[in-house]
Amino acid sequence: MQVFWFIPTHGDSRYLGTSEGAREVGIDYLKQVAVAADTLGYEGVLIPTGRSCEDPWVVASALAAVTQKLRFLVAVRPGLMTPTLAARMAATFDRISGGRLLVNLVTGGDVAELEGDGLFLDHAARYEASSEFIRIWRDVLAASHDSGEISFKGRHLRVKGARVLYPPLQRPHPPVYFGGSSAAAHELAGEQVDTYLTWGEPPADVALKLADVRKHAERHGRTVKFGIRLHVIVRETEAAAWAAADDLISRLDDETVARAQAVFAKMDSEGQRRMAALHAGGSKRTREALEISPNLWAGVGLVRGGAGTALVGDPHQVAARIREYSELGIDTFVLSGYPHLEEAYRFAELVFPLLPLAVRNKLPGQVLSGPFGEVMATGIVPRASQS
């Protein structure tokens, strides 16, 4: 099992939908979050993409220099960059980071944003272009290890003699991640990507999506790994966790929710439609209505686009829900919490010891170079309580 954290390049706060409790998200703060994730033992971080965010490649390049083992899941955008240029960017980042790049293929579903960026393709055409894009990207990087070149002619993209002179460290290319809920997305995932990502829906719904992607992958003679994107609100007691969830949306008003939902309703995204359905387009507002599955809360999606659900509970409850998703075949968990710096520590301290993680976890055990609390009486090292 791998656990990733999130770099909040679109802002961070203690409350959703208000500037109250917000903090300045400059490079110094982003470095704090990245170094915390690296030190705590998170496998990697997702850096978001889109006009509401800082550029992910620039941010990732800055953060790679201040981290040691942390991997970076960074977006490539079909239609907004050429596949060969994106391949060169990926190869360079992989080389200068010591092989720490993961690539997130993002087709996009916000029509207004896409048109503002110069992309005027409908849903079907965007996925066709994405398929051609990632095929060229993968092939030109694979060829780069032998100083080769490729040519390709498709409906949307064409390259002739494409080359990447400096190959990535990872062979044949950095792993490709991809998320999408439409039939076209599942077909693309089964045919070309390494890890399929889903947003946090109830386990039964997630199981159906994974089964469909597996079916497409089998048809192409492939296997695909799976990941899930979730927020987390974990506290030492269940009551405290639900109080924190209520507090997160306590500054929301009807107008703010309605404005956000109006934007989401215009998107050409099956995944966003499914997220909105979980809270009935913003009409569900009570804890009972927003808890759509045990410990799975849809409150974040009232005003946040994309991943809109959170696991809420005490450490054992949250770990149990994670194991439930793991039993479906998910081995990568991309998590976040508000504010992202504090919650990176909280989740690692409370939940990491309960999960079957790789050796990156530095929290268990008692070593003087690790976390042991404040030394008492000039020489007494604190130990874990026996209660």
UniProtKB/Swiss-Prot annotation:
Q: Which UniProt keywords apply?
A: Flavoprotein, FMN, Monooxygenase, Oxidoreductase
Q: Which reaction does it catalyse?
A: an alkanesulfonate + FMNH2 + O2 = an aldehyde + FMN + sulfite + H2O + 2 H(+)
Tell me which EC number(s) this protein carries.
1.14.14.5
This entry's Gene Ontology molecular function terms read:
alkanesulfonate monooxygenase activity
Q: Does the keyword Oxidoreductase apply?
A: yes
The UniProt entry's GO biological process terms, in alphabetical order, are: alkanesulfonate catabolic process
Q: What does this protein do?
A: Catalyzes the desulfonation of aliphatic sulfonates.
Family designation: Belongs to the SsuD family.
Q: What is this protein called?
A: Alkanesulfonate monooxygenase
Species of provenance: Cupriavidus pinatubonensis (strain JMP 134 / LMG 1197) (Cupriavidus necator (strain JMP 134))
Which gene specifies this protein's sequence? Answer: ssuD
